[in-house]
């Protein structure tokens, strides 16, 4: 993606610090690491941002301490309703990546948040086309 015309964003909170973003992203999967790298590249280009990274069990890594830290937003992979609830408890704007499909209805707790959903069918077709063309 070309970012022609965009300017470096120097956002500051009321306390004067840059955006403090909670990242709830598992890193064992190469795809998730690529997504994380994309987020970090964007932050480097348009930041500065401060990050708090959670890669495993939420409670063990301090998701409850986001208010103490001054978290201003979150980007999260969530696989269960409990994970969604834990992230929403931070009470900050959230971008959910591939949330559970069962939580995507109009009355869902996710209905007021940005959700990025992979199109697995399109990915599969693209992979099949690639190999069929060889």
What are these regions (language model features)?
Residues 1-75, 83-134:
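Bacterial carbohydrate/catabolite-sensing allosteric modules
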């Amino acid at each position: 993606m070309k970012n022609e015309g965009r300017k470096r964003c120097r956002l500051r909170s009321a306390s004067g610090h840059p955006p403090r973003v909670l990242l709830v992203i598992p890193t064992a999967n190469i795809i998730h690491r690529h997504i994380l790298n994309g987020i970090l590249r964007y932050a480097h280009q348009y930041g500065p941002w401060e990050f708090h990274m959670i890669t495993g069990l939420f409670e063990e890594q301090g998701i409850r301490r986001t208010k103490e830290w001054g978290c201003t937003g979150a980007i999260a992979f969530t696989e269960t309703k409990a994970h969604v609830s834990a992230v929403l408890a931070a009470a900050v704007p959230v971008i959910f990546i591939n949330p559970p499909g069962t939580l995507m209805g109009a009355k869902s707790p996710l209905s007021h948040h940005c959700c990025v959903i992979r199109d697995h069918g399109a990915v599969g077709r693209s992979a099949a086309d690639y190999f069929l063309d060889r």
